[in-house]
């Protein structure tokens, strides 16, 4: 699955956060560390993504909105 970076950026802006603020909350001293990820220049790791989503106020159950390829749930036989 691929992270929808446009959605990530839109949600950050909707929450009123700057790249500097997100980077700071991630514990990074430089905005560029976050900006490179948001712009697709550096891959976002699983733990980084979970932390960014949490900073934006999303629970783990809501993370699916950030993925471009949603896999349908498998139906289990009764």
Kindly give the residue locations of the regions a language model identified.
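A short, Lys/Arg-rich alpha-helix, primarily the initiator
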Residues: 1-14
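Residue-level signal for the short linker/turn that defines the boundary of a DNA-recognition helix
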Residues: 6, 17, 29, 44-47
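Residues within the helices of the helix-turn-helix
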Residues: 9, 20, 50
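The alpha-helix within a helix-turn-helix
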Residues: 12, 23-24, 53
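Residue-level detection of the helix-turn-helix DNA-binding "recognition helix"
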Residues: 13, 27, 38-41, 68
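Short alpha-helical DNA-recognition segment
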Residues: 16-36
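Short, charged recognition helix plus adjacent turn
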Residues: 36, 54, 61-78
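Short, basic-rich loop-to-helix N-cap that marks the start of a DNA-contacting helix
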Residues: 41-54
């Amino acid at each position: 699955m691929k992270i929808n970076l446009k959605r990530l950026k839109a949600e950050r802006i909707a929450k009123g956060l700057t790249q500097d603020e997100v980077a700071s909350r991630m514990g990074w001293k430089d905005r560029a560390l976050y900006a490179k990820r948001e712009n697709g220049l550096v891959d976002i790791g699983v733990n980084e993504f979970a932390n960014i989503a949490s900073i934006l106020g999303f629970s783990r159950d809501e993370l699916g909105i950030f993925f471009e390829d949603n896999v349908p749930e498998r139906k289990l036989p009764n």
